[in-house]
Amino acid sequence: MAGSLVAQLKKGSTAALLLGLLREREMYGYQIAAELRERGGDNLSLSEGSLYPALHRLEAGGLVKARWQAAGPNRTRRYYSLTAKGRRHADTSVAELQSFARLMIRVTSGAPG
C-alpha cells in the first residue's frame, strides 16, 4: 500500500518537482533525471517515459521553454528553463507543496496543532 501512495504522491507532484529544479538553473533532460535521483533516490526517479512528456506538458502550458545546444561533435542537448510565467508558477507550487508537507507531518506525527 505504501508503494501506491508514494506513486500517487510522485505523480501528483511531478510538475512542482520539475519546476522547483528548473527554478535553480537551466538543465537538460538527463541532468534533471540525475538530480531527482540524487536528491530523492528511487522514490523520486523518473523514467524517460514520464520525464519528457511532463516537460512537454509544461512547455505547452507556457511554463517552460526549451532550446537546443551543441554538446560535442554531432551531439545536441535540449535545455529546459522557466519562462516568467513558469517562475511565478514554480514559486507558488513549491510553496504550496512545502506547506502541505509540513501540515501532513504535523497531522501524522500526532503533534498538537
Spans of model-derived segments:
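Long, low-complexity, charged/polar intrinsically disordered regions in eukaryotic proteins
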Residues: 1-2
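Basic amphipathic alpha-helical segments that dock to polyanions
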Residues: 51-58
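Beta-hairpin "wing" of winged helix-turn-helix
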Residues: 59-76, 81
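Amphipathic alpha-helical dimerization/coiled-coil segments
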Residues: 88-113
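Accessory beta->alpha helical hairpin/"wing" motif in late/C-terminal subdomains of nucleic-acid enzymes
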Residues: 82-87
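N-terminal helix-turn-helix DNA-binding core of bacterial DNA-binding proteins
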Residues: 6-50
